[in-house]
Amino acid sequence: LGQLKDAPHDVYAIFSTQEEIGLVGARTTAFRVDPDIAISIDVTATGDLPKALPMAVELGKGPAIKVKDGGMIAHAMVRDMLVEAAKQAGVPYQMEILLGGTTDAAAMQLVRSGVPSGCLSIPCRFIHSPSEMVDEADIHNAVKLLLTALRTCE
């Protein structure tokens, strides 16, 4: 957050709870904050192991910009803003389509009259296990992408 002193607008970082049991924290917080846009930061599954479910997201190929998942379709403006930010920041990125599951953005897009919402995901193997695995470069690139998006969005 300290790197966002030059952002052209207010930025709220929300660390919510109860995502796995109904997106409760995201829903109530988005209602209270009433943001112009919302970007959820989450992890997503990968399909880069022989016994993994087929999925076009791989570890080490950059953060994933969500197109859709089992509970939401990313708002086109937010999705395109994240893609443009990745290009401006010079970071690799992947497009994510998750057939099941969802993220906090699904709840945030439904509050009040609707909040344009999207999601930036960190590719992760073995989600919801004691041995989750991410590529450190994907995390650093996600931070660069997000900072660029927040500094340049209008």
Language-model features: where?
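Alpha-helical metal-binding/catalytic segments enriched in His/Glu/Asp
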Residues: 1-20, 142-147
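Secondary-structure boundary elements
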Residues: 1-12, 34-36, 88, 154
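Solvent-exposed alpha-helices and their adjacent loops that cap or buttress functional pockets
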Residues: 4-8, 30-33, 57-59, 111-113
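Short, conserved beta-strand edge motifs with alternating hydrophobic and charged residues
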Residues: 12-16, 38-42, 96
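Acidic, glycine-rich active-site loops and adjacent beta-strand->loop/helix elements
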Residues: 15-21, 44-45, 124-126
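Metal-dependent peptidase/peptidase-like ectodomains
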Residues: 24-92
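Active-site-adjacent substrate-binding region
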Residues: 64-137, 143, 151-153
